[in-house]
Amino acid sequence: MTAEITAFGTTASGEPVEAITLRAGDLTAVVLTWGAVLQDVRLAGVPYSLTQGSDLVSDYEDKMRYHGSLIGPVVNRITGARAVIAGHEYEFEHSMYGAVTLHCGSNGTHVKLWDIVAADASSVTLAIDLPHGEGGFPGNRQIAVRFWIEAPASLRMEVTGTTDADTILNFANHSYWNLDGTPCWDGHTLQIKADHYLPATEIFTPTGEIAAVEGTAYDLRKPRVITVNNPPLDNCYCLGRERVALRDVLTLTGTSGVEMIMATTEPGLQAYDGRHAIRPGKAAYEGLAFEPEFWPDATNHPEFPSIDLADGDTYHQLTEWRFTKP
């Protein structure tokens, strides 16, 4: 079957953005060429989107620039906006608190147009080239992401990347989820299969401690109803120390009974409660973000799993979301 590709809008600079609608089984998803955004996810019989999006490109260029996007080349924080890569020091954009690089700032893949490489009724592959030196990062990098749906209601995302010089890569989808379609996610049940997490500083960078969740508010190893600030979430959960085969790491269940199981190959999962992720006309805590990735600020913590990618090597991430309803 042919792909369903439609005009979505134009950027502030006049570039056209397209929307690709994927369908299979009970699931429908919409992916944008802007930022490789996962704009809409719908489960048959549920009268609202499970992820939070917008119908306006201008929102994704502004306050919603992280909503649903694929963030890279390095997601999350880099303390001091600097890193040593293959013995050379590089400096990046100071995009947060004047001393931290957050989501690669104005050069991230979430604020770029991607090219459609292939598409059919249930899948799309997008690609983008990142030139050497852009944002301070070394290497000419070729990045591709494939989204596809498998019946009955599974959405998968595969990210690959190569470079012609030693560099660092760490991508994550940054979708916000609310399985009830309500103004606040309060009352969802959450389980994260992690024994440890990374405590954060006042500017939300890792302290360097790898802390046990046991005995803390961050212990989500068993399903638990969460509420706003219980716990306050903007931390990375440590799922392991290396990329592994796809395995289930998270279960989120709304009061509606709609359930999402997330699986990933990645060793970390940044959980964020959406306190500052406010869509136009909406309020804080509308959705929960779960970002499968390597641990944040890894370049400044040699004890963390490495995000180095050498010339000739290939970056490869696989993440899956599976949905059910009562």
Predicted regions and their residues:
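An exposed, glycine/acidic-rich loop-and-rim segment of catalytic or binding clefts
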Residues: 1-326
